[in-house]
């Protein structure tokens, strides 16, 4: 009986759980059908919808938005409950709209002071980012006192931020990034005591930043970069004990690095670049326990104070374009977690410190270009480097053969040094090498046996390379050969990392251009200023991804290969200052992206290809050739060209053939009189006076011969 009651009790408990589950589940199922939306909230949303147009995606949508689409387009269509509209969230009990997320919604138009958004009094979250809104929005939202999250980034909002911004006292997140806000930041910003993130970058703010910022004790992120703030950093920033990120770059802040930054013990990222800071870098900066990223570039700092004991947390140190002098400071070798070191464009001298071998476990990007460093490249100190740039120094010797073991190396730039070596064909073993720059050194010899599978940019110009290039030379240059899809191009990234991006200088379209960032789809080949001879390899036509091709200032001969017409992505072509002859291949006229070309100072002749690209070239691109002609050249370049209709032009091949013909004609012309003269003389010798002939011709010749023999 006891077992029966136990069993009955168990059943009762089980049924109770089932009933409870069903009742809860039915509530869940019924919830979407409940009409929560309050009428005045619905009206405000519908009016807001009519205030703006749905247009094209904003310029940044395709990059930053996951699924951009017009969210307001479906509002009101067969659904009267605004709480179920896309981008709208309501309070489950009261039906008040508390969140409005219209980011990436293709919305276009100008905000006015009476915008219906001001009637959504209970909003806590408002996200209008990644649209094309214009005008002044602040007067429309200054009374939304419940807001905790406000994101207006990536729009075209303008005007000043009013002092009434301080009324939004519950804000924890304020993002005005990438707009056109102007004027001074009001001191009432200090009333936002709950704020954790303040993002004002990429606007037109100016003047001194308000010292009231020191009252935001919860602030973790302060981003002010790309504005026109000036003066010294407010000392009250030293009170922000929770601050982890401080970005002040590209303003007009000035002075020395203030000591109160040493109070920011939680700081992980500090960017002071592109301002007017000066003096020495204080030693205490390297003792901040959590500091991971420091950017001091583009200021006028002159040196480093040595720290007592640097913290090992430092991962990225960028100090380019300052006035640093002397040797590279040795304390850098103690930053064992360093992944990026950029000290380019300074006045450092001496050797590259061997102690940098301490960094080999983590260092992936090293940039020391544009200094006065001397000696050779150290061996065996960089194991996992992805990019090495030591261009524009005074380095000597040879490339260390240990480079062939740098299996992660993607970029190698040693341009404008005094390196005296043969072509490093052994670098073909590097599986990830994409950029190789050897220009302006003393490299010499042939460059055969080179096949690079990943190489996309190679610049070996202005060296002493020589010899011929086999016809199949470029067959194995895979990265320049495979045509990328439109999707590949749209998804192209820049070489480098989040904290550092590779750069280089390249001759493009006749101008020395600096690539501040290198796209992963950019391709270029520059062999100019060497002593290459023979024909241009026909396999050049396999490099269908090539954008820039420069073979100028060599001794190439023969015809320009028609296979160049297959370089469908080509934008710049320079084959000037060679010994090329024949016609410019008509196929080149079909290259629709080719905007700059130079065929000058060769022995080219014949009809210049048609096509709009050729019509827009300057006369200097064709000057000093044997006889190029075409309607444009005859009309616009008469000073350097004679129309072919008035003159017959000959290539070196036809000149040789003509010389042969002329020689045969001359021989024939001389042959007939010779026969006549010979017969006449013979007739005289036989029938008339042989004594006279001997007297006239024979004795003088014999006398001369005997005189020569005697002597």
Swiss-Prot record:
Annotated LRR repeat ranges: 120-143, 144-168, 170-192, 193-216, 218-240, 241-266, 268-288, 289-316, 317-334, 335-358, 360-384, 386-406, 407-430, 431-452, 453-476, 519-543, 544-567, 568-591, 593-616
Domain of life: Eukaryota
Mode of membrane association: Single-pass type I membrane protein
Record gene name: RLP43
Subcellular location(s) of the protein: Cell membrane
Family of this protein: Belongs to the RLP family.
Name this protein carries in UniProt: Receptor-like protein 43
Segments on the Cytoplasmic face: 688-711
Pfam families xref list: LRR_1, LRR_14, LRR_8, LRRNT_2
GO (cellular component) term, any one: plasma membrane
Signal peptide: 1-30
Coiled-coil parts of chain: none
Annotated PANTHER family: DNA DAMAGE-REPAIR/TOLERATION PROTEIN DRT100 (PTHR48060), NON-SPECIFIC SERINE_THREONINE PROTEIN KINASE (PTHR48060:SF24)
Regions that span the bilayer: 667-687
Keyword terms, alphabetized: Cell membrane, Glycoprotein, Leucine-rich repeat, Membrane, Receptor, Repeat, Signal, Transmembrane, Transmembrane helix
Membrane-side (Extracellular) residue stretches: 31-666
